[in-house]
């Protein structure tokens, strides 16, 4: 998407490409973003969240491929303030990606509601498309791979088959490695690749489980927050894995994948009434 927009619309729009690093992505993801810069000349701006005192929204700082954190530091800073994110408290996207990106854009002098946010959802993912304008930040989302040049997953695979490089990880390792939005199957695949990938989340649960309020099935609870569906901890999740037989490999042409559930930007409807409080500017 970014390549076609740059090639076909650069003269029509002022474009900025931003990568918000959470510190929990696979190293290969960062390598890939850097390779795109080198090969395509994207001049991507790398940023990380800057968590401020209570009452002040999350800001940003500019980093580089070389200085970007790779051991979960930005993620931990968000958890220290807002608590463990999970299905009921999905503030990780808001505080690690959405707010830092909007903070950077504002620093350029762009104002809310006066710029477009291009999102790389494909034409074969219609359920992920959100046409409404966010009431929280007046964000206007556009979907070039749906409306401007309809593109499905096979088209994307064809494009990368013609390039000299690609994202060198399987689908289950996309986004934050142990994201709670991934299916149990994909999380088991992550575990079988390297069980140490879960160390960060296990540490965060132990360290910050009691930060923030907690509700389970709509009822206030004194129990600590935990990451995974069904109110499961990292330990509970791992105990549920059936390791007796190897899982089948991902089909690269399958339309389902972990990326299908991890949104770059939240819609207003995705913020539950009992979610963590968000500061606004």
Predicted regions and their residues:
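Nucleotide-activated chemistry modules centered on ATP-dependent adenylation/adenylyltransferase
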Residues: 1-281
